[in-house]
Curated annotation (Swiss-Prot):
GO cellular component: cytosol
NCBIfam families per the UniProt record, alphabetical: LSD1
Superkingdom to which the source organism belongs: Bacteria
Protein name per UniProt: UPF0434 protein BMA2274
Family: Belongs to the UPF0434 family.
Amino acid sequence: MDARLLEILVCPICKGPLHYDRGAQELVCHADKLAYPIRDGIPVMLVDEARQTVEGTPVDPAGPARGR
C-alpha cells in the first residue's frame, strides 16, 4: 500500500481518518464502524463494498494511515 495514498484517503461517508489494518488488508473508519477492503493493493472505497466492524476490533498497531 502506497504511503502517499494512505495520507490522502478519508472515509467516503464522514470524511474522517482511516486506519490501515495490514493483516486484514482493510482501511477502517472507527466513527462509522466500517472497513473498506484493499484488493491487489487498491483500496475499494465504495460504501457498498465495506463491511460492518465490531466495536473493539483490533487495528494494526502501526496506527492510523495518516502521517506515514
